From Swiss-Prot:
Catalysis: reaction(s): L-glutamate 5-semialdehyde + phosphate + NADP(+) = L-glutamyl 5-phosphate + NADPH + H(+)
Enzyme class: oxidoreductase
Keyword terms, alphabetized: Amino-acid biosynthesis, Cytoplasm, NADP, Oxidoreductase, Proline biosynthesis
Record Pfam families: Aldedh (PF00171)
Gene this chain is encoded by: proA
Entries under InterPro entries matching the protein: Ald_DH/histidinol_DH, Ald_DH_C, Ald_DH_N, Aldehyde_DH_dom, Glu-5-SA_DH, GPR_dom
GO molecular function: glutamate-5-semialdehyde dehydrogenase activity; NADP binding
Transmembrane regions: none
A single BP term in Gene Ontology: L-proline biosynthetic process
Role description: Catalyzes the NADPH-dependent reduction of L-glutamate 5-phosphate into L-glutamate 5-semialdehyde and phosphate. The product spontaneously undergoes cyclization to form 1-pyrroline-5-carboxylate.
Protein name per the record: Gamma-glutamyl phosphate reductase
Family: Belongs to the gamma-glutamyl phosphate reductase family.
Length: 419
């Protein structure tokens, strides 16, 4: 069984490699045509997608998936329309391929330039959210890359139909069928095989939790861009506008707790903790949030659960919030750089020096002053849909849009020069 699965993946890799050569020189018009055709097809076949998704949801409930995972798994007419609209927005974005990043003339007469080119074949391993299938495929096609998709087994039925629609729409426009392929297997070994497909994958992008990250660190020999995990913090400074802070904290935790840019820990300066925490915690608890606090926070609000040491490192993806009282912005920076995942961090303060210190010292892809962490998103930043939020420093950091799915090459024009 394992051998046949590995052989199937290698065959898919060969098809993807061949398709990537076609896509590298495909016109913007052709790529946009495929994206728009896919968007129309997703909407036209929405009922079939919802039916397939219902099977996944039923199986997920039987298997005991958490409410947070089921929420991420669910598709409905509105979310399918959002997927289609996302593809139309990608089609409307400028094509990064061929963009001239610089051109200069050397003393020997050589004209040296640098341009954007596709990466080639991109593999993505992701969990739960079937809308990622459409977003990732759309971005890769627009950036001239072939893509090999390995979604979570809990979303297999949903991913099958979405990937089939995308591949067929692209094929109808003249793009090789190997451009968009789904790894159609529930066997988790498929992900491990992908991590070693050096001959076919130019980069692997895993989107998932601690387990997936650990597996990638153990097994991957292909280049990897880590994305996803968001142990995000909001620090309320001694000179914060408390009304503003309360709105931001509530939004960062409650608006959509199952996503990676939701806040997981609230840090509060001791000077304002007594004034801020009682009302803040009451509002959060009223929205169903479970509060786990340090000893100092429990002295102020006794009826909250005690925080364990592991709570400071937890990405809950649920209506749970850890709370810690600290003495200074420096303590907040130290806590975040020790326990954060490099995703999104926020300070609420009217003090310019504290804001500047926080922004400069916190090691994260996105650092906010007086705004919710929930804004870390490709669409919000103006990139269109995103491949994920990179939490590493090479090759990309933060929301990965079209430009982050390209590389560069040098072009040199001469007139007979030799060295």
């Amino acid at each position: 069984m394992d051998k046949s699965l590995e052989e199937k993946l290698m065959e898919q890799g060969k098809k993807a490699k061949a398709a990537s050569r076609f896509l590298a020189t495909a016109s913007t018009t052709l790529k946009n045509e495929a994206l728009l055709k896919t968007a129309d097809a997703l909407e036209a076949q929405g009922a079939e997608i919802v039916a397939a998704n219902a099977i996944d949801l039923e199986l997920g409930e039987k298997q005991g998936l958490t409410p947070a995972l089921l929420e991420r798994l669910a598709l409905n007419e509105s979310r399918i329309k959002d997927m289609a609209q996302g593809l139309r927005e990608i089609a409307a974005l400028p094509d990064p391929v061929g963009e001239v990043l610089g051109m200069w003339r050397r003393p020997n007469g050589l004209e040296v330039g640098r341009i954007r080119t596709p990466i080639g074949v991109i593999g993505i391993i992701y969990e739960s959210r079937p809308n990622v299938t459409a977003d990732a495929a759309g971005l890769c096609l627009k950036a001239g890359n072939a893509i090999l998709l390995r979604g979570g087994e809990e979303a297999l039925n949903s991913n099958r139909i979405i990937a089939r629609i995308i591949a067929q729409s692209a094929k109808d426009c003249g793009i090789p069928e190997g451009a968009v392929q789904l790894v159609d297997s529930e066997d988790r070994q498929a992900a491990v095989y992908m991590m070693k497909m050096n001959d076919y994958l130019d980069v692997l992008i895993p989107r998932g939790g601690k387990g997936l990250k650990q597996a990638v660190l153990e097994h991957a020999s292909v280049p990897v861009i880590m994305t996803g995990m968001g142990n995000c913090h909001v620090y309320v400074d001694a000179l914060a506008d408390l009304s503003k802070a309360q709105k931001i904290v509530f939004n960062a935790k409650v608006q959509r707790p199952s996503v990676c840019n939701a806040a997981e820990t609230l840090l509060v300066n001791a000077k304002i903790a007594g004034d801020f925490l009682p009302a803040m915690i009451a509002e959060l608890k009223g929205a169903g949030v479970e509060i786990r606090g340090c000893e100092r926070s429990r002295e102020i609000v006794p009826d909250i659960l005690p925080a364990r040491e592991e709570d400071w490192d937890e990405e809950y993806l649920d209506l749970i919030l850890a709370v810690k009282v600290l003495d200074s912005v420096e303590d907040a920076i130290e806590h975040i750089n020790c326990h954060g995942t490099g995703h999104s961090e926020a300070i609420i303060s009217e003090d310019y020096s504290s804001v500047r210190r926080f922004i400069s010292a916190v090691d994260a892809a996105a650092v906010y002053a007086n705004a919710s962490t929930r804004f870390t998103d490709g669409n919000v930043f103006g990139f269109g849909a995103e491949m994920g939020i990179s939490t590493q420093k090479l090759h990309a950091r933060g929301p990965m849009g079209l430009q982050e799915l390209t590389t560069t090459k040098f072009i040199i024009y001469g007139d007979g020069q030799i060295r």
